[in-house]
Amino acid sequence: MTIRPAYRPKIVKKRTKHFIRHQSDRYAKLSHKWRKPKGIDNRVRRRFKGQYLMPNIGYGSNKRTRHMLPTGFKKFLVHNVRELEVLLMQNRVYCGEIAHGVSSKKRKEIVERAKQLSVRLTNPNGRLRSQENE
């Protein structure tokens, strides 16, 4: 039985396109990642019509759906079994994600304990070898 979220609203993003850096299309040495323009004559900073848009607080997501996964859960990073038990009372709101540096031996323990506690994991199959490969 899979665990379902307690509350699953429609997640609406105000803007899905990335904000790109001014003149990053013109020069290869400038990456596309956003950097705030600081020049005194910069037309992006002065918000001229037809220029790139600058990120601001108005593009923020709805507070209830911020950091929410498409499944309706919020992510919680888990490094060991003890951290997983924090999610026991919040298993309808948060799902666990096993951290990158956790060994495959500990991963098996975390996955087993998550099933017992009925806590959902985003990456339960990560780095788990089957019996035939061992």
UniProtKB/Swiss-Prot annotation:
InterPro entries in the record: Ribosomal_eL32, Ribosomal_eL32_CS, Ribosomal_eL32_sf
Alphabetized UniProt keyword annotations: Ribonucleoprotein, Ribosomal protein
GO biological-process terms attached to the record: cytoplasmic translation
One Gene Ontology molecular-function label: structural constituent of ribosome
Domain of life: Eukaryota
One Pfam family linked to the record: Ribosomal_L32e
GO cellular component: cytoplasm; cytosolic large ribosomal subunit; cytosolic ribosome; nucleolus
PANTHER family linked to this entry: 60S RIBOSOMAL PROTEIN L32 AND DNA-DIRECTED RNA POLYMERASE II, SUBUNIT N (PTHR23413), RIBOSOMAL PROTEIN L32 (PTHR23413:SF1)
Family per similarity comment: Belongs to the eukaryotic ribosomal protein eL32 family.
Protein name, entry field: Large ribosomal subunit protein eL32
Species annotation: Drosophila melanogaster (Fruit fly)
